[in-house]
From Swiss-Prot:
Protein name stated in the entry: Leucine aminopeptidase 1
Propeptide: 19-84
GO BP, one annotated term: proteolysis
Location of this chain's protein in the cell: Secreted
Family: Belongs to the peptidase M28 family. M28E subfamily.
Organism from which the protein derives: Metarhizium robertsii (strain ARSEF 23 / ATCC MYA-3075) (Metarhizium anisopliae (strain ARSEF 23))
EC annotation from Swiss-Prot or TrEMBL: 3.4.11.-
Cofactor binding notes: Binds 2 Zn(2+) ions per subunit.
PROSITE patterns listed in its UniProt record: EF_HAND_1 (PS00018)
InterPro entries noted in UniProt: EF_Hand_1_Ca_BS (IPR018247), M28_fam (IPR045175), Peptidase_M28 (IPR007484)
Enzyme class: hydrolase
Species lineage: Eukaryota, Fungi, Dikarya, Ascomycota, Pezizomycotina
Subunit-structure text: Monomer.
GO molecular function, a single term: metal ion binding
Keywords: Aminopeptidase, Disulfide bond, Glycoprotein, Hydrolase, Metal-binding, Protease, Secreted, Signal, Zinc, Zymogen
Amino acid sequence: MKLSQVSALAACVPAATARFVELMEADHVVLRPDEPTFLIETAPGKTQWVTEEQKWELRRDGQRFMDITATKDLGSQGLRIKESVEFPKKCVNQDEVKSLAKNLDTAPMKANLEKLSSFHTRYYNSEWGLKSSDWVLEKVNEMIKEAGADKTVTAQSFPHTWKQHSVIATIPGQTNSTIVIGAHQDSINLWLPILAAPGADDDGSGTVTIMEVFRALLKSKDVVQGKAINTIEFHWYSAEEGGLLGSQAIFQQYEKQQRDVKAMLQQDMTGYVKGTLDAGLPESVGVIVDFVHAGLTKFIKTVIEQYCAIPWVETKCGYACSDHASASKAGYPSAFVIESSFDKSDPNIHTTSDLIEHLSFDHMLQHAHMTLGFVYELGFHNFAKAVEGDGEL
């Protein structure tokens, strides 16, 4: 193995700024020149070149990262803190949310997860990954048609340079200010990508949780008719397991288009409670508190207290632990809620044992209640009025 010629590479990379990733020679690893290599970021500004095999080795060792090979300029537009975003101090749409919440049901989640986890794998660069993303798009469009919302609500694929596409559903509001609900649709077997990867919890559970919220939200005539103040989007990301590839591509485009994303909530792993219960602890949802937007995270706690039957616990997951990190890097307020405290989360992920039998659909339903409350409250929140000081926060 030979050392990469980092000085030659450096000449091809834009000069670093406070928002650009700085490529340091000391960060480069030993490479075989005949192998494709990828630039990953394991911490803010800390990068190294790796092969795909080395990516999976790092993941097996518990190292999370962003693959920034094609997204080195993510965050370069200077959107971060360009303007202060104020979030509500309390929930004000209880009647509407609780009425819509009656439509939330574990049966559709179970049926959808059975289908999603039946694909041999949802590895993003496989034919199975393509087929599973086709199914996600088909299912979302089916929900739109069943709700009679196809004149206003749309769903489309977001293509990538790999096989699996992301899916974006859009519910137009009165303004272009946007609330994003996200989950990643891909799965991975970290021992070898071609091996079976049912991915029931990671992140089949999040995928079907936000599907169910989307289905329930379309029961609102006000939402379907575009009466929400803000536009609402549901994202099902491709290639999260490869280094947040799909979400980075989307938020890179949004950043370049100067899209006004007011809030992004990620749901990644929503179904496993055994670790919590076995530890003698009460069932709860885990609110991530590192590498997230503090104000948005505080609001999420308020939403959980208002709309969930179980409490929240604070927990940490490290840098780039899910797709909210892509939104955050682009300068958008983002947050992440997981099934439990991080140390009590599902030990079966990334293996053939990530199966439905280990999951609680009642727990997933709590995540759905939280997500529905979150998206409805913020969908109808007047951010402009709040900034002016005329609205109640």
